[in-house]
Structures are given as C-alpha cells and as structure tokens.
C-alpha cells in the first residue's frame, strides 16, 4: 500500500486475516466467532494531517515512511474522504503563490464530516498577524466560492486564530435516529465515520435489554453515551479534556437528551470517588449513590484499563468494552475474565490495510 494507492482488491483478504488474528488472541477467553463489520474500501478517513514540503516554487503535502522516515509526496489520499481530497488540491493552489500564507507553513490538518463540512488548520513556525488573517479570509472565501463548506484556523506557538469557528457538526444516522455530534478541531473524534455508525449500532444492540443506569468512562464528545442513552434510565459519563466536555454538553442539548450527566474528571479520579477514597468539589450536587448502574461502558486509550479501574469495573454486572488495541484488551481480560464471561465479540475494521484492529466485547457477570 502507498498513500496514493489502496489495494482495494485485497480488502477481503486483509479483513479475513484480522478475523483469524482476533480469534487467536481471544481464544483463552472465548470461542465466539467475531461479528465482523466492514469499512468502506476507500474514502473512509474523515480526518488527516500532512506535513508541507517547500521545493523551490513547488509546494506539496508529504508523509514520512514509518520505517525509513523518508519523505513521500502525497497529491491525493484515497484513504481520506472525498472532501479532504478536494481540499488538498484547493489548499495547495490557494497557498502556493501566496507569500503570507505560504511562509513558514509546515503542516495542514483536515477534519471533515459526512455532512460535507470541514475545518482546515494551518500550522506555522512564525507569528500570525492581521495580514495573515486578511489573506486567510480571502482564501476561505475563494474556497467557499468553489462550494467547499470550510472553516480555516491558523496555529503557531501559543497562538490560535479562528476565522469563524473551530468546530463542525457531524450528523450520523444511528438505528433510525439522526445523531448530531459537534467535533472540535485538535480534539479526538472517531476517524472512520461509517465504522463509527456501525460501532454505535452494535453497542445499542448489545445493550438493548439493559436495566437501570449506564456509567461511561472516557466519554469524549459523548459519542457513545448519547447514542446509548435511549437504552438506559440515566447515563453518567466522565471525560478529562475540557474541549471534549464542552462539545459533549452541546451535543446533549442538540440531541434533546435529558438523561445524560457529564463529569469532568479522569477515570482514575472517578474510581477514587466511587470507592469513597477522595471527595471532589466538582461532584457537588451529584449523588453518585442514587445511580443504579448495572452496565459500565469503557473505551480506553491504547494503554487499556489501569489495575484500579479493572477492579472497579468488575463490580458491574455488564461491561461493554470498545478497544482500539486488542493486546491491552486481552491483558485486561486476564483479570476481568475471573468474574465475567465474554457474551458478545465484534471486530470493527476501523483502519483497513493496516495491522490495527478495533474490537468490542460485552462481558456479563457469572
């Protein structure tokens, strides 16, 4: 695979290999055959970032080859959304011969939605001034004249200039209902929107017979907690990043959801609060004991759950675990499988043509 060529004819084979690999990894804990969810074979990534290479009068996107670190020129990127590909061409054309916009520009980040909105961030090794803003506004207007619904942001050390806004609103059809998700520039969002829809619908199906309340750790912008709210009486969710918490609060209102409470704190801190080890001012007015959480949802970073959180989640009858790293999932399962059985297993092909796998498990207490 090269950045400008996807081996789409090998899609089925690479997915089959992942299924075999996941089954092998999960064998000590379950003999279930994974439910498999396919990605679009191309144009599946909704975000991408590229370094910029200045070569005389020429200017182009590059990425670095992982092993050799050599530069690879990228004029098109079929893994990314069609809108990103359109913007890649339009941005180079708009910046190449503009001294103010081009000077010391070293990176461009693209964030797009299925609803055809985009935020493009230009990163610089220089101070940004009013002249930069004026030229950037002219470029933005030219892009919009090409029917590109785009917002531009300039970034430099300790500087961020938003011409309009630093977010876009994604609209996803999830099990017969449209979900609105505000996505903020430079914050985590699910990279593969089509796969995200399938993950949300799988999680909804896995929890459809649930009772009581849901607790979610690492909720981000509320991606899962808001979609799952329809299956539970109440949802209590934690997140540490301020922009994600703000986006989650917006998403609660935009989706007219009244049974979700977001708390800004780390999963480790929440574990301490639940266990009565520490009290936190930010939990004032929230009666943790009033929640009857029979299900806990975790979507941890690649490092998986820490040992204290492992112990905490074992107290719940049902654990829904989405993992972006099956190796750390299996490490966690060495502990969790002492009290819970794997009752559902899913493979989500979030990153086609790569070694990476995303998977989901539903664990039920013995």
UniProtKB/Swiss-Prot annotation:
Keywords: Methyltransferase, S-adenosyl-L-methionine, Transferase, tRNA processing. The keyword tRNA processing applies. It comes from the Bacteria. One of its GO terms (molecular function) is tRNA binding. S-adenosyl-L-methionine binds at residues 190, 218, 223, 239, 299. It catalyses: uridine(54) in tRNA + S-adenosyl-L-methionine = 5-methyluridine(54) in tRNA + S-adenosyl-L-homocysteine + H(+); uridine(341) in tmRNA + S-adenosyl-L-methionine = 5-methyluridine(341) in tmRNA + S-adenosyl-L-homocysteine + H(+). One of its GO terms (biological process) is tRNA methylation. Its EC number is 2.1.1.-, 2.1.1.35. It holds the Pfam family tRNA_U5-meth_tr. GO terms for cellular component: cytosol. The keyword S-adenosyl-L-methionine applies. The active site is at residues 324, 358. InterPro entries: MeTrfase_TrmA_AS, MeTrfase_TrmA_CS, SAM-dependent_MTases_sf, TrmA_MeTrfase, U5_MeTrfase_fam. Belongs to the class I-like SAM-binding methyltransferase superfamily. RNA M5U methyltransferase family. TrmA subfamily. Dual-specificity methyltransferase that catalyzes the formation of 5-methyluridine at position 54 (m5U54) in all tRNAs, and that of position 341 (m5U341) in tmRNA (transfer-mRNA). This is tRNA/tmRNA (uracil-C(5))-methyltransferase.
């Amino acid at each position: 695979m090269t950045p400008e060529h996807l081996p789409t004819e090998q899609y089925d084979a690479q997915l089959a290999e992942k299924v075999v690999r996941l089954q092998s990894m999960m064998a000590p804990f379950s003999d279930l055959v994974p439910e498999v969810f396919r990605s679009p074979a191309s144009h599946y990534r909704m975000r991408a970032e590229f370094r910029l290479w200045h070569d005389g009068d020429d200017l182009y996107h590059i990425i670095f080859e992982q092993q050799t670190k050599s530069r690879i020129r990228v004029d098109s990127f079929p893994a990314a959304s069609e809108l990103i590909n359109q913007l890649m061409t339009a941005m180079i054309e708009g910046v190449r011969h503009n001294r103010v916009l081009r000077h010391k520009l070293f990176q461009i980040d693209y964030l797009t939605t299925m609803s055809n909105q985009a935020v493009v961030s230009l990163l610089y090794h220089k101070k940004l001034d009013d002249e930069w803003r004026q030229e950037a506004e002219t470029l933005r207007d030219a892009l919009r004249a090409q029917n590109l619904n785009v917002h531009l942001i300039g970034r430099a050390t300790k500087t961020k200039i938003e011409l309009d806004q630093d977010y876009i609103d994604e609209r996803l059809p999830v099990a017969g209902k449209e979900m609105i998700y505000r996505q903020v520039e430079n914050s985590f969002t699910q990279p593969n929107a089509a796969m995200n829809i399938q993950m949300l619908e799988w999680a909804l199906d896995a929890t459809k017979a649930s009772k009581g309340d849901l607790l979610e750790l690492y909720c981000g912008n509320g991606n899962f907690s808001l979609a799952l709210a329809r299956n539970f009486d109440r949802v209590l969710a934690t997140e540490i990043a301020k922009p994600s918490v703000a986006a989650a609060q917006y998403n609660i209102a935009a989706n007219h959801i009244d049974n979700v409470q977001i708390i800004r704190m780390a999963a480790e801190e929440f574990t301490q609060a639940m266990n009565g080890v520490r009290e936190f001012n930010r939990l004032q007015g929230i009666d943790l004991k009033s929640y009857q959480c029979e299900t806990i949802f975790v979507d941890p970073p690649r490092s998986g759950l820490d040992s204290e959180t492992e112990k905490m989640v074992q107290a719940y009858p049902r654990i829904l675990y989405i993992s972006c790293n099956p190796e750390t999932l299996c490490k966690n399962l060495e502990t969790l499988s002492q009290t819970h059985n794997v009752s559902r297993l899913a493979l989500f092909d979030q990153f086609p043509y790569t070694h990476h796998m995303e998977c989901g498990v539903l664990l039920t207490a013995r």
